[in-house]
């Protein structure tokens, strides 16, 4: 199989690296013509409304503006990002199908699943990383907790469900760790992404969730209250909300 010539490959890598996205593509790149010569597809392993989707759409707009080719965002949520990853891994290795997902789900799936429909080492090539930021811990107004400490006390005496945006994701691990260290019985409820998770927090079906500020902000005026942020420092967007550290 012919490999892509150095100049088009360099153009592609420069475009992706400059935008700082978490992007992967099929491992073998066989396109020999100038890139891009046709529309590009970005597969997002989560539904619309979350941070990963927002990054993909911003990235798509920038690529279109730079190269004049249409860039389509294709949301393929489900199975902890396996569906989206598989769609890209089995696409033609021509540089026109990209994957946008979270690094956590990519690597943790190797541990969670005994068999995957793709080989991460052979079928995909990492291209770039996007910057990460603190996550927001939010509860519905009917939960009386104002801090994580108060929430843990609440969870010890009340049935508690916690939303996660994928099995094995960071929120899933937090729930498991709190159960182990504090004796709670928080039940993790897995969603196909952040957007539907936060909607269920707002409706009161979930007692707590952890996710990006961008997705949390869509329900912040609909009865969801932040009680903490991850990371070492407070978020400039939520300066009155304490960190979990």
Residues covered by each model-derived region:
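Beta->alpha turn/N-cap motifs
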Residues: 100-105, 109, 194, 210-216, ...
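C-terminal lobe and pocket-closing loops
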Residues: 132, 215-245
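Immediate post-signal peptide segment of exported/extracytoplasmic ligand-binding proteins
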Residues: 25-42, 92-96, 152-161, 221
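Hinge/capping helix and adjacent helix->loop/strand transition within the periplasmic-binding protein
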Residues: 90-96, 111-196, 244
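Alpha-to-beta junction loops
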Residues: 91-100, 158-160, 184, 202-209, ...
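N-terminal secretory signal peptides
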Residues: 1-25
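Short helix-initiation/N-cap motifs at beta->coil->alpha
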Residues: 76-84, 133, 189-199, 214
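Extracytoplasmic "Venus flytrap"
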Residues: 42-55, 77-79, 163-170
């Amino acid at each position: 199989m012919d490999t892509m010539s150095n100049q088009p490959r360099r153009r592609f890598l420069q475009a992706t690296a400059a935008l700082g996205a978490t992007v992967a593509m099929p491992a073998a790149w066989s396109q020999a013509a100038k890139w891009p010569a046709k529309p590009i597809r970005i597969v997002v392993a989560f539904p619309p409304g979350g941070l990963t989707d927002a990054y993909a759409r911003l990235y798509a707009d920038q690529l279109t503006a730079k190269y004049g080719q249409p860039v389509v965002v294709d949301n393929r949520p489900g199975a902890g990002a396996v569906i989206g990853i598989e769609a890209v891994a089995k696409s033609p290795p021509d540089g026109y199908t990209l994957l946008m997902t979270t690094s956590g789900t990519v690597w943790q799936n190797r541990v969670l699943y005994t068999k995957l429909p793709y080989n991460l080492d052979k079928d995909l090539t990492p291209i770039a990383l996007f910057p990460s930021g603190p996550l927001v811990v939010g509860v519905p107004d009917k939960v009386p907790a104002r801090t994580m400490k108060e929430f843990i006390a609440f969870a010890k005496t009340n049935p508690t469900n916690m939303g996660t945006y994928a099995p094995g994701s960071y929120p899933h691990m937090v729930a498991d760790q709190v159960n182990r260290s504090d004796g709670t019985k928080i039940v993790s409820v897995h969603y196909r992404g952040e957007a539907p998770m936060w909607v269920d927090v707002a409706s009161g079906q979930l007692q707590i969730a952890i996710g990006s500020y961008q997705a949390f902000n869509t329900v912040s005026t609909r009865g969801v209250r932040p009680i903490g942020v991850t990371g070492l420092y407070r978020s400039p967007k939520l300066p009155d909300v304490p960190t979990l550290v």
